[in-house]
Regions:
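Short, flexible beta-strand-to-coil junctions
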Residues: 1, 11, 62, 240-249
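Acidic, glycine-rich loop-and-strand cores that form catalytic or ligand-binding grooves
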Residues: 159-249
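Core domains of carbohydrate- and sulfate-ester-processing enzymes
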Residues: 129-171
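Enriched but not universal
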Residues: 1-59, 83-89, 96, 116, ...
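Short, intrinsically disordered, charge-balanced linker/junction segments flanking boundaries
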Residues: 15, 37, 69, 154-160, ...
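Periodic beta-strand elements of RCC1/NHL beta-propellers and select beta-solenoids
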Residues: 59-66, 118-124, 240-243
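Glycine-rich strand-loop-strand elements at beta-sheet edges
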Residues: 34-36, 41-50, 61-114, 128-133, ...
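Bulky hydrophobic/aromatic "packing anchor" residues in well-ordered structure
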Residues: 42, 81, 112, 122, ...
Length: 249
């Protein structure tokens, strides 16, 4: 099909949306045509085979980072590349689509590549910090863990890199219940721990909330769950939210 192709790629429903230009291509776990747009949705890694070169726009989301353990920070969301850039896909070329996944460490990245060269890289989110450990850097940054000492701020959140990413929140002091910071999300930083009136063992510390994600329909109004069998109502169309932090009391 010629026209505007869109590639949507994420580990809940990944894919490629083909863009302006006379592109002929196949691939994806699901394809849908909505108006002048043809959407290639990748829910798992696979090939995107171009038989007639042209342009496409890509929505790609990296895998989410894992939470830490023991008074830990929340895991962060992966980077969201969101259809803004028009990419050129070469004639008679097979592109490898690798869908990033959540892990117990940093999330793995989502990529499109051919001949060993990456056309798209969406970074995975950073892992949340353990007790007395900073959150990992990533797409969005992981939340910092609690500690290392009483009456002071805890460990810092990881920094963010790439499009639609935010840093992780700071963890609390080394006081019960040892609360961590939230992981960064696509549209909001991870929140710092919340504490009571004073930094004492009796303070009611609360782990920081994860940063807010982004609605797919805010990127493209066609990306409603009703239009794609790969989408589910359960995710409410919100992607790349950061994870909330835990505590240890």
């Amino acid at each position: 099909m010629t026209g505007i192709h869109q590639l949507l790629m994420t580990n809940f429903a990944g894919g490629i949306a083909t863009g302006e230009g006379q592109l002929n291509a196949s691939g994806g776990n699901e394809t849908q045509t909505i108006g002048i747009y043809k959407y290639h949705v990748f829910t798992s890694s696979g090939d995107f085979t171009v038989t007639g070169g042209g342009n496409a726009r890509v929505l790609a989301i990296g895998g989410g980072g894992g939470g830490g353990h023991n008074a830990s920070g929340g895991g962060a969301a992966g980077e969201v590349d969101d259809f803004q850039e028009l990419l050129v896909f070469d004639n008679s070329t097979t592109y490898k689509v690798s869908i990033g996944t959540g892990t117990t460490n940093n999330g793995s990245q989502t990529t499109i590549s051919a001949g060993g060269t990456n056309l798209v890289v969406s970074l995975g989110g950073g892992r949340g910090g353990n007790f007395s450990t900073a959150g990992n850097n990533g797409g969005s940054g992981g939340g910092g863990g609690a500690g290392p000492s009483a009456h002071t701020s805890g460990s810092s959140g990881g920094s963010a890199s790439g499009d639609n990413t935010n840093a992780g929140g700071t963890g609390g002091p080394n006081d019960s219940p040892f609360a961590g910071g939230g992981g960064g999300g696509a549209t909001q930083v991870g929140q710092n721990f919340a504490n009571g009136a004073s930094h004492t063992a009796d303070s009611e510390q609360i782990g920081g909330a994860g940063g807010e994600g982004i609605a797919l329909t805010a990127i493209d109004t066609n990306l409603a769950f009703a239009n794609f069998s790969s989408f589910t109502e359960a995710n409410s169309g919100i992607v790349a939210s950061g994870g909330g932090a835990g505590s240890n009391r």
